[in-house]
């Protein structure tokens, strides 16, 4: 499932945009609660369980420093990957059993160009960034990819399969997902630029 291919004209510098995005970064959905807090010590710490992340940043953390931004984005990616690996495959397996569908394997990837994909071999890839989305949209992407197990296209039979699994809400959910893609496009563009070629040590 491809995301909207938006190339926005940024009205502020990449560093300024990242500073604002990171200061206000929070996830509060039925699947995940992710909070950034500022502590009183000079060290970062993380409290993590499945469905919950609390990242305590060092006192005086400088959101405008490019190196700090890169570090924080990479930490966010690492934590989202952990959550996605523990939450998304079990949901996919549950839906597959419910609708009597058979897939091969599920992979969680750091991809922002699309939310998910299904190969002709029955392998399903899901973006770790799905953890940002509301539960109903996350489930929609999972069901969308499961529908491709029977229909490897986006024709009428495919949408009939999606509607079968979404109580005839396939097109409406697709529109909502496209709107969510628009809302996250600039953030993804900036985060990708800042972290390109870097990994956590």
Could you tell me what each predicted segment is?
Residues 1-139, 149-201:
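Active-site-proximal or metal-binding-adjacent scaffold patches in catalytic folds
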Residues 142:
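Walker B beta-strand of ABC/ABC-like P-loop ATPase nucleotide-binding domains
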Residues 145:
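Walker B catalytic acidic pair
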